[in-house]
A protein has these predicted regions:
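An N-terminal assembly and electron-transfer interface module characteristic of large anaerobic redox
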Residues: 1-250
Length: 250
């Protein structure tokens, strides 16, 4: 295949919407009244989002879904309806469960077969899993150009990175607006500049091998959001992750 602007546009939207679906699913699943309801809702949205991204916002599955009944779902509407549907899912009236965060090497963090199904284990212990999104990992470079320029002399094209930051803000705006309608049920992610500042208080932004300083920033973000229990998952052979992950735990 050929990488085109249109493909990149859809890829960014897919990654951001994937993060949103993960956030919503993990937030409500431990509290669902009807077992399996959250997974079924996720599976419906998985099909709808795929169709909408592939067919420029149109989804035949969405048109046939009783609680949706609309064929055209542009990106902002997708975000809003995803949050709305998960927010409306019936939940048990119980206190918030102990939250356990998951950070680490990018494959092990998200791939159930690689992390021994860590989210399932967390939920089986009557806890709630919290996993930072993959877009944070994919978009660190534009936010550390000043540090790289000052200390490494290789900041890159500042105009290009400024354009990337502006574009990412535009992509994230509908997600933030959608999450805001849930009145606190779903947490907003910290802006990337704030994550850079958090990490700089504990480690150096020059720690860029593997997940680098971002892993530290995610741990701090989780702690500040009321999730002091954090699993740092890493494969045996990933030395940078062992150093930055285990080192920061120490």
């Amino acid at each position: 295949f050929k990488v085109t602007p249109a493909l990149l546009h859809r890829t960014v939207k897919a990654l951001i919407l994937g993060d949103l679906l993960m956030k919503c699913l993990y937030r409500v699943r431990p509290y669902e009244v009807e077992k399996g309801a959250a997974n079924r809702l996720y599976e419906q949205w998985d099909v709808i989002v795929r169709e909408a991204l592939e067919h420029h916002g149109f989804s035949k599955t969405a048109a046939k879904t009783p609680w949706l009944k609309r064929r055209y779902l542009p990106y902002p509407v997708l975000a809003r309806e995803i949050v709305k549907s998960f927010d409306a899912l019936p939940l048990k009236d119980v206190p918030r469960k102990v939250r356990v965060g998951v950070v680490g090497e990018i494959l092990v963090k998200y791939q159930p077969d690689a992390n021994n199904h860590v989210v399932d284990v967390i939920e089986s212990q009557d806890c709630e899993a919290v996993v930072p999104g993959i877009m944070e990992f994919m978009t660190t470079r534009p936010y550390i150009t000043d540090w790289n320029e000052k200390y490494l002399g290789t900041g890159g094209n500042k105009t290009l990175y400024a354009l990337m930051r502006w574009s990412l803000d535009r992509y994230n705006a509908p997600i933030k607006a959608a999450i805001a309608t849930s009145h606190g049920k779903f947490k907003q992610d910290d802006p990337m500049p704030e994550l850079v500042e958090k990490a700089a208080e504990v480690t150096s932004i020059g720690v860029q091998a593997g997940e680098g300083w971002l892993l530290t920033a995610e741990i701090l973000e989780l702690i500040e959001q009321g999730c002091p229990n954090v699993i740092c998952a890493q494969p045996f052979a990933c030395l940078p992750n062992h150093v930055t992950g285990r080192g920061m735990f120490g």
